[in-house]
């Protein structure tokens, strides 16, 4: 091998190493961002499951009991029902968002992840 060929091989190796390092940094950034988004989506699912849905259900039950006791009108009962349904819809949207974020994270990692189970 001549000096020119050796120099060219070293340059080619350095270029390939830089490309590898750049791609690795991009993937690492995608993983970090994916993890942040997945964790945020998971926290939202937990908020709906542990707080908002039970509150909406309790409000609906209380309003239904008040309606049966003739202490509130039918419109309030319908409003409580709509609120409960809206919370349920938002919960399932948040759950779908979480699952989508986990799928994105798996694509970035390149392997299936053992995500914590999210109960419906």
Where does each model-flagged region fall?
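Terminal intrinsically disordered/low-complexity segments used for targeting and assembly
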Residues: 106-120
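Amphipathic alpha-helical coiled-coil segments
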Residues: 4-90, 97-108
């Amino acid at each position: 091998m001549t000096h020119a060929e050796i120099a060219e091989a070293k340059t080619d190796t350095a270029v390939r190493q830089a490309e590898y390092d750049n791609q690795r940094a991009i993937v690492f950034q995608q993983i970090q961002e994916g993890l942040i988004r997945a964790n945020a989506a998971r926290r939202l699912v937990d908020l709906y499951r542990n707080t908002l849905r039970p509150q909406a259900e309790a409000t609906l039950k209380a309003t239904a009991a008040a309606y049966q006791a003739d202490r509130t009108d039918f419109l309030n009962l319908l409003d409580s029902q709509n609120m409960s349904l809206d919370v349920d819809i938002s919960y399932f949207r948040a759950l779908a968002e979480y699952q989508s974020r986990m799928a994105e994270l798996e694509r970035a990692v390149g392997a299936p992840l053992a995500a914590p189970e999210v109960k419906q």
